[in-house]
């Protein structure tokens, strides 16, 4: 997926910012969250999050659900590198495995469980 954040901010600027964040907040993870291209779901009020490393993916789902005002029966799926991450994993584990060279973790969200639909 193409992340708008990457297109709006040059790599060096992102990397510099990501590096500063990691040094200043070593127990937190910088995350960029954007809606998948064809998702029929609400927009987030912001894209950039700084979350505790020990927060689980499941807890992060809850946080994002609240921010886009989803009802309990509405589906929400995350994609990290086109794969749905396990809800039991911590954001720190996800970050260690999937962060990019700019020190950010990128997560796409959708109402569909198949990426790109």
UniProtKB/Swiss-Prot annotation:
Heart, brain, placenta, liver, skeletal muscle, kidney and pancreas. Keywords: Apoptosis, Autophagy, Cytoplasm, Cytoplasmic vesicle, Cytoskeleton, Golgi apparatus, Lipoprotein, Membrane, Microtubule, Protein transport, Transport. InterPro entries: Atg8-like (IPR004241), Ubiquitin-like_domsf (IPR029071). Its main location: membrane. Residues 36-117 are annotated as: Interaction with GPHN. It comes from the Eukaryota. Residues 36-68 are annotated as: Interaction with GABRG2. The record marks 17, 28 as: Interaction with LIR (LC3 nteracting Region) motif of ATG3. Residues 117 form a propeptide. A lipid is attached at residue 116 (Phosphatidylethanolamine amidated glycine). SUPFAM superfamilies: Ubiquitin-like. GO terms for molecular function: beta-tubulin binding; GABA receptor binding; microtubule binding; phosphatidylethanolamine binding; ubiquitin protein ligase binding. One of its GO terms (cellular component) is intracellular membrane-bounded organelle. The precursor molecule is cleaved by ATG4 (ATG4A, ATG4B, ATG4C or ATG4D) to expose the glycine at the C-terminus and form the cytosolic form, GABARAP-I. The processed form is then activated by APG7L/ATG7, transferred to ATG3 and conjugated to phosphatidylethanolamine (PE) phospholipid to form the membrane-bound form, GABARAP-II. During non-canonical autophagy, the processed form is conjugated to phosphatidylserine (PS) phospholipid. ATG4 proteins also mediate the delipidation of PE-conjugated forms. (Microbial infection) The Legionella effector RavZ is a deconjugating enzyme that hydrolyzes the amide bond between the C-terminal glycine residue and an adjacent aromatic residue in ATG8 proteins conjugated to phosphatidylethanolamine (PE), producing an ATG8 protein that is resistant to reconjugation by the host machinery due to the cleavage of the reactive C-terminal glycine. RavZ is also able to mediate delipidation of ATG8 proteins conjugated to phosphatidylserine (PS). One of its GO terms (biological process) is extrinsic apoptotic signaling pathway via death domain receptors. It is found in: Cytoplasmic vesicle, Autophagosome membrane; Endomembrane system; Cytoplasm, Cytoskeleton; Golgi apparatus membrane. Residues 1-22 are annotated as: Interaction with beta-tubulin. A lipid is attached at residue 116 (Phosphatidylserine amidated glycine). The keyword Transport applies. Belongs to the ATG8 family. Ubiquitin-like modifier that plays a role in intracellular transport of GABA(A) receptors and its interaction with the cytoskeleton. Involved in autophagy: while LC3s are involved in elongation of the phagophore membrane, the GABARAP/GATE-16 subfamily is essential for a later stage in autophagosome maturation. Through its interaction with the reticulophagy receptor TEX264, participates in the remodeling of subdomains of the endoplasmic reticulum into autophagosomes upon nutrient stress, which then fuse with lysosomes for endoplasmic reticulum turnover. This is Gamma-aminobutyric acid receptor-associated protein.
């Amino acid at each position: 997926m193409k992340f708008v954040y990457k297109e709006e901010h040059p790599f060096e600027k992102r990397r510099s910012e990501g590096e500063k964040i990691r040094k200043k907040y070593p127990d937190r993870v910088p995350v960029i969250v954007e809606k998948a291209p064809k998702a029929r779901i609400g927009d987030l009020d912001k894209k950039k999050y700084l979350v505790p490393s020990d927060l689980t993916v499941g807890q992060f789902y809850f946080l994002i659900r609240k921010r886009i005002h989803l009802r309990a029966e509405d589906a929400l799926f995350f994609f990290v590198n086109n794969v749905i991450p396990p809800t039991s994993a911590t954001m720190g584990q996800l970050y260690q495995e999937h962060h990019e060279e700019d020190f950010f973790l990128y997560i796409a969200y959708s109402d569909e469980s198949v990426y790109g639909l």
